[in-house]
Structure formats: C-alpha cells, structure tokens
Amino acid sequence: MTALRLIVGLGNPGPEHAQTRHNAGFRFVDALIERSGARWALDSKLFGETAKVEVAGQPVWLLKPATFMNLSGKSITAALRFWKIEPEHLLVAHDELDLAPGTARLKFDGGHGGQNGLRDTIRLLGHGKFHRLRVGIGHPGHKDRVVPWVLGRAGREDDAAIGAAVDAAIDVLPLAMEGNFNEAMKRLHTEKK
C-alpha cells in the first residue's frame, strides 16, 4: 500500500466559517497541528496554509486551502505539483452529509458525492484516485436545507460527536501513514462498544 505524503483539510477560509459543519476537514488538520505543536504558514504559491509534521515518525505535509471550498482543487493540485507528490499519496479530509456526526470513514477512489471541494479536485486531477477521510456531519433531512446546514454551526451534541470522529481518525492515522489502509479502515469503521 501507498504511504501518505500530503494531508489536506477542506473548508472555507475566514472566521465566519471557522466553526461550520462544512469545515470538518479544516478541523481534522487543525487537530493534527495542535497535537504536533507545529504552526500554519501562508504559502501564496500553493493558495493555502501549509505545515510539515511527523506522524508515526514519518514526515507529512498538511494543507488548508485558502480558496473557498468550490476552488479547493487549485490549491491541492498546486501542492501536488510543487512537492512532486502523486495523488495516491494524498488524503483529503472533508465533511460528509451522508454520515452521522460521530462517524468517520476512510476510502480510496470514487466520485465527489456532491462535495464541491472534491468535485473541483477530481475535475483538475482528471480522476478520483486519492484517499479521503469522510467526517460525518449528518443530513438536515431535505435537500433544500443542505446549504444552510453545511454553512451553519453544529449543536453542542453534534459538535462533540464530530470532534470524537476527528480524534478517532487521528488515532488510526499512523496505520495510514505506513500505507496500511485496510487495517486503518477496519479499526476506524468498527463501532466502539
């Protein structure tokens, strides 16, 4: 299996978006930064904030696109080119409407599932052959309420559940860093009792 070299968190920049459901990907990479003690640095040529951290003794780049969600692919493809990283070494963390808060799932390849940051990334790469971390934010129940839902803040209970899902994903990240995605998926996808 392929080890990770770049982890991207998807979200929208700016304080008005900081705590929204749509920024679950930012929340994941911010938690990695917090645990590592590293700091974000703005990199205009990569259209985002970057940091280099170690996970399980291995170096990995982190990226938070400073573009809005719909243009995330611009930042991601610039980083892949600049650091000469193939997409199969990429993990993109993003919010997932189709998973309940408190749920996180790893997957490789596939479509965008309506997630605009993934849509733009797949469009610019020409394929979806990269790893994803899907962080559940739940669904509002009707498609007409999706936009205000993702751009809104989660209630206390859902917010705590999203935080727990982020923590669970970080706990299995060392396995993914080593390229052992099957074991990472097995552990992350197994319900805790």
From Swiss-Prot:
Residues at which tRNA binds: H17, F68, N70, N116
Site note Discriminates between blocked and unblocked aminoacyl-tRNA, residues: N12
KW Iron (keyword) present: no
Catalysis performed (reactions): an N-acyl-L-alpha-aminoacyl-tRNA + H2O = an N-acyl-L-amino acid + a tRNA + H(+)
Organism for this UniProt entry: Xanthomonas axonopodis pv. citri (strain 306)
EC code(s) of this entry: 3.1.1.29
Subunit relationships: Monomer.
Protein name: Peptidyl-tRNA hydrolase
Top-level lineage group: Bacteria
Molecular-function annotations in GO: peptidyl-tRNA hydrolase activity; tRNA binding
Compartment(s) where it occurs, according to its Swiss-Prot or TrEMBL record: Cytoplasm
Entry keywords, A to Z: Cytoplasm, Hydrolase, RNA-binding, tRNA-binding
Residues forming the catalytic site: H22 (proton acceptor)
